[in-house]
């Protein structure tokens, strides 16, 4: 059996995967012929994968795959005509309006080689730095903070630090869901080392539920919390004065400001929203342990003060002398598989390749290397600015690669309108179905994961080869190839690349040149400059900096450990934040702060995962999580529809330096079902970022968010924007299986859900007559079934006696087993089918808890009850153990024991079942004197 080692296509952990096939010839294999497992030799995951990673092969069966270039009209083109059209249009646009009238918008899904060629094309030959990436939306605040502190965008540590730390502090990071494989490593290390886990997050997330200390701070209080920590460390004389004097600058200024906060811990605790006991406990944990590591993610980055907040964390570790030491320091958790690779090649509009800026010497080096007279001489427009310029008509041609900005950028309606109005839009995609692809004037078929080859760099600076193992069908091409074809047709030299290996060779050579001229730069691929194609193809996972070929394969490499930094003075910089107070907002009566985040089993805008049935099952429709107290306050009902709309002119009260009113542009609204979740703060709502028009009639959450940004990084502040929530009254709602209409009069809610055996659509109508009329024909069979007081209106559409469409409606949410209901499609409609249909409807449905095993809430409830009864019968009520029951349940069902991302949900479900069983027994036995039973489920 032949095996191909590659990397996962999802988060920044950068897991290795092994793909094998029994077929001797890989040129004609498809997903059905393959087996995928974790690569047990890869240093990121050692064989482990999360639920999404385990289903990577399922992602290949896209419902609609783009195989040939085509125009918006649908007319197909060959590559020669498509590339000529793009080249001619870009050239004409630049000739008439200048180089900054064009732009490229890239993605952390691209490989480093794709990124490099795109940046060379734009900054070196088109002479514009209007090249940005969707990494701006997730990583740029951390990038800006590290550049300010260290002089370069460099994560100092590695994953091994998480396994050596005495205290791990996760800030704004639901790592159990966003980086599940890494979180399992963290939990294992905590258990082995008796370490402490601190989670700082306004939400009681799956990660927070497993922490030794959870600080549920106010939104935006991260900066104040860590600035106060710096003052506390100084007050307690815990800072490393010798290190500070020898290796840093700016401490005296920042510490004076910080000590004003730490002077009164009670006031500080009130500001950040925790008890003084919790605040002191956290500060003492940091002060009294030698190995403390702080890792942050989107909860910090996606804020209008994200850069300052990150610098506040770095300040603390600089003061302790932690940077570059084992088990210590600051670590930025990357969201995408190649966000770091894109930054290395200059994928952000604010930098050049190899971590260079726009100084004249850096420009000249790059111009000489690329053999051009000049390159782009100033920073370009970043993501939000780029699409603002598009809306204003300043950018007249844009090429979007591997990303879906109509969904992922804030103020989605404005983005869609800007693209619709733009004279020329090119989109490179694997599917024509994304919201952005539908607005392309030219749509180019790109090779996706499994087809393309190149490299990616993960959160800890490890470069991994992503290898193709399926031959691309149709005319799908690598993104670097498409850019090169256009560049050559525009008359540019330097794009005669034979393959991805030759691109990487050029990139490594540029890195060596930059290191030679600017020796303080940390980024270094000098050791990879002499790789042959065969050596490149066989390259093992390797962590940079790589000064010599002898370092190929190295891991656990830390930088800045000697106190030498990439700043002009060689010293790290303490950064004094512009404002340290927690932002205060006065919210009207029907207003909450909307927080956005991930669903456990989905990825980005769902173009890769939305069609995978097992990953869709846990959350079939858009939902908004609300505290139970808000339902009556806002006149909402659980399971009911909610309209979520942005409040205009609600500017976070930081200061004029950090809040630009011009950036607070008009936004629209979205809709979701209300879900009661008392882990949500009472002033907050939570909705996932994944939904789009591709799957939902009311599109996604960014419909309701405006485009406020961090003033330094220009990263959008997706977290905690004020919104109004109002109920949406549905006359009828339900599910339709089989044939369906994509639009109908009065249809205000429609969500497509992929099942193992087809697709169903969740629907809702504001008018009863419209609901009954939907898909009704003179031959439709209709009747009413009442289940537990709920009337259900059933309609069967038939063709030659076979069921073609099944509609189940009610006045409230319909809860049926979707897979089993869909099995009726295509079967003869007779008395037996109707009897089985009634039985299935009455059986109801149970929520999916574990995507890896398919275990539902009902499965866990049944097994916990069985364990409870068995223990009572064998040991007596006084000696029962919840932990034993939970362990046995997980062992039998497998839930929470594979990727581990559902562990907290499994435990929560089991705990409720256990409590219900105990409550039932109370009338038969006095258990007040049995503290061990109560403690088991506390």
Swiss-Prot record:
Paired cysteines (S-S): none
Sorted alphabetically, the keyword list is: 4Fe-4S, Cytoplasm, Iron, Iron-sulfur, Metal-binding, Molybdenum, Nitrate assimilation, Oxidoreductase
How would you classify this enzyme at the top EC level? oxidoreductase
Q: Which GO terms describe its molecular function?
A: 4 iron, 4 sulfur cluster binding; metal ion binding; molybdopterin cofactor binding; nitrate reductase (quinone) activity
A cellular component term from Gene Ontology for this protein is: membrane
Question: What does the entry comment about cofactor binding?
Answer: Binds 1 [4Fe-4S] cluster. Binds 1 molybdenum-bis(molybdopterin guanine dinucleotide) (Mo-bis-MGD) cofactor per subunit.
Q: Which residues bind [4Fe-4S] cluster?
A: 8, 11, 15, 50
The job of this chain, per UniProt, is described as: Nitrate reductase is a key enzyme involved in the first step of nitrate assimilation in plants, fungi and bacteria.
State the protein's name. Nitrate reductase
State the taxonomy lineage.
Bacteria, Pseudomonadati, Pseudomonadota, Gammaproteobacteria, Alteromonadales
């Amino acid at each position: 059996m032949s095996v191909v080692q590659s990397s996962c296509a999802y988060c920044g952990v950068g897991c290795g995967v092994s793909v094998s096939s029994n077929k001797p010839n890989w040129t004609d294999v498809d997903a059905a012929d393959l087996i995928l497992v974790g690569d047990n030799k890869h240093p990121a995951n050692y064989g482990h994968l999360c639920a999404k990673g385990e289903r990577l092969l399922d992602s290949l069966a896209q419902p609609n795959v783009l195989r040939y270039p085509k125009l918006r009209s649908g007319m197909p083109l060959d590559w020669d005509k498509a590339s000529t059209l793009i080249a001619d249009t870009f050239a004409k646009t630049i000739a008439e309006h200048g180089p900054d009238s064009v732009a490229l918008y890239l993605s952390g899904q691209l490989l480093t080689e794709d990124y490099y060629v795109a940046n060379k094309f734009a900054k070196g030959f088109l002479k514009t730095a209007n090249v940005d990436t969707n990494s701006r939306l997730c990583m740029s605040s951390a990038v800006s903070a590290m550049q300010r502190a260290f002089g370069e965008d460099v994560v100092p540590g590695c994953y091994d630090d998480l396994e050596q730390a005495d205290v791990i502090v996760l800030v704004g990071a639901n790592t159990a869901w966003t980086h599940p494989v890494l979180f399992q490593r963290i939990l294992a290390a905590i258990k082995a080392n008796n370490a402490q886990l601190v989670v700082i997050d306004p939400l009681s997330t799956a990660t927070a539920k497993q922490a030794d200390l959870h600080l549920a701070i106010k939104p935006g209080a991260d900066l104040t919390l860590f600035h106060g920590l710096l003052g506390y460390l100084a007050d307690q004389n815990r800072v490393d004065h010798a290190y500070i004097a020898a290796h840093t600058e700016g401490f005296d200024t920042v510490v004076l400001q910080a000590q004003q906060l730490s002077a009164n811990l009670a006031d500080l605790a009130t500001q950040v929203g925790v008890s003084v006991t919790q605040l002191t406990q956290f500060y003492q944990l940091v002060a009294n342990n030698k190995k403390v590591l702080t890792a942050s993610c989107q909860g910090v980055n996606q804020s209008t003060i994200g850069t300052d907040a990150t610098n506040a964390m770095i300040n603390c570790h600089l003061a302790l002398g932690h940077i570059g030491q084992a088990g210590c320091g600051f670590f930025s958790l990357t969201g995408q598989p190649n966000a770091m690779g894109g930054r290395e090649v200059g994928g952000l509009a604010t930098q050049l390749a190899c971590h260079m800026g726009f100084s004249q010497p850096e420009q000249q080096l790059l111009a000489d290397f690329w053999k051009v007279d000049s390159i782009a001489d100033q920073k370009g427009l970043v993501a939000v600015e780029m699409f603002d310029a598009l809306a204003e008509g300043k950018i007249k041609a844009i090429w979007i690669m591997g990303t879906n900005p109509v969904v992922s950028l804030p103020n989605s309606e404005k983005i869609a309108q800007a693209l619709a109005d733009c004279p020329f839009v090119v989109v490179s995609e694997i599917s024509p179905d994304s919201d952005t692809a539908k607005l392309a004037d030219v749509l180019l078929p790109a090779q996706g994961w499994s087809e393309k080859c190149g490299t990616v760099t993960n959160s800890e600076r490890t470069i991994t080869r992503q290898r193709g193992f399926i031959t691309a069908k149709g005319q799908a091409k690598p993104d670097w190839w498409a850019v090169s074809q256009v560049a050559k047709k525009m008359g540019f030299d330097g794009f005669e690349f034979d393959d991805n290996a030759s691109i990487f060779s050029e990139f490594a050579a540029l890195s060596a040149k930059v290191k030679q001229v600017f020796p303080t730069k940390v980024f270094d691929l000098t050791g990879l400059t002499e790789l042959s194609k065969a050596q490149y193809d066989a390259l093992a996972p390797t962590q940079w900096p790589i000064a010599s070929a002898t370092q190929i394969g190295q891991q656990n490499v830390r930088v800045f450990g000697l106190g030498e930094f990439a700043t002009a003075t060689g010293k790290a910089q303490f950064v004094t934040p512009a404002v340290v107070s927690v932002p205060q907002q006065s919210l009207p009566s029907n207003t909450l702060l909307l927080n956005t985040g991930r669903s456990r089993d989905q990825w980005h805008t769902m173009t890769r995962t939305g069609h995978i049935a097992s990953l869709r099952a846990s959350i079939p429709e858009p939902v908004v999580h609300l505290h139970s107290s808000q339902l009556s306050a806002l006149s909402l009902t659980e399971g009911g529809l909610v309209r979520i709309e942005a409040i205009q002119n609600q500017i976070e009260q930081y200061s004029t330096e950090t809040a630009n009113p011009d950036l607070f542009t008009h936004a629209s609204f979205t809709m979701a079902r209300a879900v009661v979740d008392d882990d949500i703060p009472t002033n907050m709502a939570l909705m996932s970022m994944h939904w789009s028009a591709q799957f939902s009639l009311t599109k996604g959450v960014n419909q309701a968010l405006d485009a406020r940004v961090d003033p330094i990084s220009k990263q959008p502040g997706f977290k905690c924007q004020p919104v109004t929530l109002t109920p949406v009254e549905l006359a009828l709602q339900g599910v339709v299986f089989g044939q369906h209409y994509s639009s109908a009069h009065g249809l205000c809610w429609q969500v497509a859900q992929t099942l193992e055996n087809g697709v169903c659509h969740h629907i809702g109508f504001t008018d009863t007559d419209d609901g009954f009329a939907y898909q009704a024909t003179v031959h439709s069979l209709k009747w009413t079934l009442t289940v537990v007081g709920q009337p259900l209106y059933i309609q069967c559409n038939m063709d030659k006696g076979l069921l073609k469409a099944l509609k189940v409606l009610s006045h409230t949410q319909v809860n049926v087993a979707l897979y089993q209901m869909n099995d009726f499609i295509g079967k003869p409609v007779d008395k037996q089918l109707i009897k089985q249909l009634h039985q299935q409807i009455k059986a109801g449905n149970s929520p999916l808890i574990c995507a890896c095993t398919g275990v539902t809430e009902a499965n866990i409830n049944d097994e916990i009850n069985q364990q409870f009864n068995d223990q009572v019968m064998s040991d007596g009520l006084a000696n029962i153990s919840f932990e034993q029951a939970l362990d046995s349940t997980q062992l039998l069902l497998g839930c929470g024991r594979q990727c581990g991302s559902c562990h907290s949900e499994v435990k929560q479900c089991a705990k409720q079942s256990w409590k219900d069983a105990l409550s039932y027994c109370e009338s038969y036995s006095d258990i007040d004197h049995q503290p061990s039973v109560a403690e088991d489920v506390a």
